[in-house]
A protein has these predicted regions:
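Bacterial N-terminal signal peptides
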Residues: 1-9
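Sequence context of c-type cytochrome heme-c attachment sites
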Residues: 58, 69, 74-78, 94-95, ...
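Internal, charge-rich low-complexity segments
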Residues: 102-110
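Short, well-ordered loop/turn sites that connect or cap secondary structure elements
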Residues: 88-91
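Sequence context surrounding c-type heme c attachment/ligation sites in exported
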Residues: 11-18, 22, 109-167
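Short, surface-exposed secondary-structure edge patches
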Residues: 83-86
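N-terminal pre-domain segments of enzymes
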Residues: 12-72
């Protein structure tokens, strides 16, 4: 009975809901291990302890749409100074997922229209490209690129090339 309780409690931690944090030089190969952004039942999901944000001045990225999320560690907060940028606590993770609409799963549609919510992001009609993480460590910010292949994205520090037929 005790073994069953141990196994069940171990499984509970691996269910996506709240995200994980990894120290420098200990980053996982798969994005899903962070629990920040993942695919579930053909839908893109984010962690319960993260929130979606948008920029008031969007940046152009070859017509790619972007899902931006921010995760600040529990019981922590960001600070603001009029003369400086925001101060984020160690453990903060900023993510930006680049994707295109792809009605047929092959070619992509160039559009800048998306309402910024997860409600209409059917993965079968998207072409996920990359998720970039900015991770706040004790020594500063570290950038990690994860390239999407199938149902997950994989750490690829050197980047990647993708052919995208356009309709």
């Amino acid at each position: 009975l005790l073994l069953c309780v141990f196994l069940l409690s171990g499984c509970e931690d691996s269910v996506p809901g709240s995200s994980q944090f990894f120290g420098s030089n200990n980053y996982p190969e798969r994005l899903s291990e962070w629990g920040l952004v993942w695919i579930d039942a053909n839908t893109l999901r984010i962690a319960e302890d993260s929130f979606i944000y948008t920029l008031n001045t969007p940046l152009f990225s070859d017509y790619a749409l972007k899902l931006r999320t921010l995760r600040i560690p529990k019981n922590q907060k960001a600070t603001y100074d009029d003369n400086e940028s925001f101060g984020f606590p160690v453990g903060t993770v900023v993510s930006k997922t680049f994707f295109y609409r792809s009605p047929n799963g092959q070619s992509v549609t160039l559009t800048s229209k998306w309402d910024g919510t997860l409600d209409n992001l059917d993965v079968d009609k998207l072409r996920l490209i990359e998720t970039r993480l900015l991770v706040r460590q004790e020594t500063g910010w570290e950038a990690l690129p994860y390239i999407w292949r199938g149902d997950d994205a994989y750490l690829k520090v050197t980047g990647d090339l993708k052919e995208l037929p356009i309709t």
